[in-house]
Amino acid sequence: MKDVALQLKNVGKSYGNKVVLESIDFEVRHGSMVALLGTSGAGKSTLFRCLTGLEPIDSGSIVALGESIHELSPARLRAVRGQIGFVFQQLHLVKRFSALENVLGARLAEMPIWRVTLKSFSRADKVLAFECLDRVGMLDYANTPTQLLSGGQQQRIAIARALAQKPKIIIADEPVSSLDPLTARSVLQTLKAAATDLNVAVLCSLHQVDLAREFGDRIVGMRDGRVVFDGTPAEFTDERVHALYQVPAGKMHQRPRATRSTRWPVWLWHEGRSDDHIHTPHTRAAPGHRTALAPERALQRQTSAGADRRHGAVVRDRTTHRNGPHGGHDGTGRGQDRGPG
């Protein structure tokens, strides 16, 4: 039996006369991923604010790593939060910073991220950041300004930043709500790998039933501020889906998804392309050229390239970043494809 990392016991929360959370009970164990489902207004966002300690609770307790977070002193609460990685729908990445710099920001909890430079970090911190980028498949983009990355890639950077804290718990609030299906699965695979490979307890809120069934070790369903289902994906039958959402289960996947990728023709998805391919960064190397480096080698390259220049901004390879963010060459001798139209 895996140890319990996060446990909610009879949690209640009200705003005036309006009850938002009532008798919430469930737990998340180390090495497992719990998918939290619910309709809009079910209380998921309020619950996540309570989990961060930003909102007080009216009754019950939230126990993280053996400590009730709403009974801790501010100093002790900061220490417990340091062992919890948060991934929010609003990523709070510094867009002008590189992917590497955003991940390194997690290593300096007491310093505002806009004051961070590469000189602020030890060699061990830099190696850890490269390892986290490698784990989420973003090592090739360590030097890339975050504003040039697609939504799915930015989400992976946020996960890498959470992993850089060496967390025992990861709490992800709607991490794939604005992503296309292929990219959403890729991001959830990254979170699932953190649970299985690093023994991290992952709590992830979702809207998509199929994704919850595919990636969750357990599913918790909320409606009207209460937990109405807590069980395995196999137990989450179509009848239980109907009971949770109060609509016929067969209609669940027919809702149109309004994402920023819907302006692209449908054939992009039929060919298996994801959001990452639509918004290709301009630091991708020529076909067949391996740019991924082992963390130690990548760090050596950073150091030799003078990575501490310009307030810590990472110096990019001139051969792969020639003509700015909107066109020109990508290092292959060909122009960038901006998509149809």
Swiss-Prot record:
PANTHER family with a match to the protein in the record: AMINO ACID IMPORT ATP-BINDING PROTEIN (PTHR43166), PHOSPHONATES IMPORT ATP-BINDING PROTEIN PHNC (PTHR43166:SF6)
InterPro entries: AAA+_ATPase (IPR003593), ABC_transporter-like_ATP-bd (IPR003439), ABC_transporter-like_CS (IPR017871), ABC_transpr_PhnC (IPR012693), MetN_ABC_transporter-like (IPR050086), P-loop_NTPase (IPR027417)
Enzyme class label: translocase
Chain residue ranges for the region called Disordered: 278-341
Organism: Stutzerimonas stutzeri
Job description of the protein: Part of the ABC transporter complex HtxBCDE involved in hypophosphite import. Responsible for energy coupling to the transport system.
Catalytic activity, as annotated: phosphinate(out) + ATP + H2O = phosphinate(in) + ADP + phosphate + H(+)
Gene Ontology CC annotation, any one: plasma membrane
Record family assignment: Belongs to the ABC transporter superfamily. Phosphonates importer (TC 3.A.1.9.1) family.
Basic and acidic residues bias: start-end ranges: 307-320, 327-341
Superkingdom of the source species: Bacteria
Subunit field text: The complex is composed of two ATP-binding proteins (HtxD), two transmembrane proteins (HtxC and HtxE) and a solute-binding protein (HtxB).
Domain ABC transporter: start-end pairs: 6-249
Enzyme Commission no: 7.6.2.-
PROSITE patterns: ABC_TRANSPORTER_1, ABC_TRANSPORTER_2, PHNC
Protein name: Hypophosphite import ATP-binding protein HtxD
GO molecular function, one term: ATP hydrolysis activity
